[in-house]
Amino acid sequence: MAAVRLARFNPGRRLIVCCAGAYHGWWDGVVAGLGSERALDDCLTLKDLDPVSLDVIRRRGHEIAAVLVNPIQSFHPNTPPPNDAVLLTSDVRKTDDSRDRYTEWLMKLRLACRASKVPLVFDEVYTGFRLAVGGTQEYFGVKADMVVYGKTVAGGLPIGVVCGRRELMQRFDPQRPMRLAYV
């Protein structure tokens, strides 16, 4: 939530781009479907690995606050994840060309975002540093503008960390970073 709010705050843009099938949490800022309390007119769902998606980002860049990418999508583009345990313990990463195809996709997405001045956000709340010591950025060799980490940072304890380029993080006072506590 903090990364999306921060992305929307900085450029004054409202539209968030998510990829089909990607999971970014259970809050109404990115979840569409039955039971949603509000219409998601500020969230756009595009297809992974599709050149049309890149064109949409280029054409609508002036409206887009950020593009969210969940690295788990590399194992099953445009579909919901089959099972969390299967994704991280199976040999699907080693026997499939999904890494190469998704790396190429992320590089093209990175270029489209940079050309449109749209922040690219890697949502690593689930994957964290499980794909590589340097996270998704190291695994795919593509730098994000902002990265979100979750429980993997704290050994399974509930925590969230948002990292980003200085100009994106300027909303936060370095002496008093945003803190949220739920009891």
Q: How would you name each of these model-derived features?
A:
Residues 2-183:
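Conserved N-terminal phosphate-binding loop of PLP-dependent enzymes in the Aspartate aminotransferase
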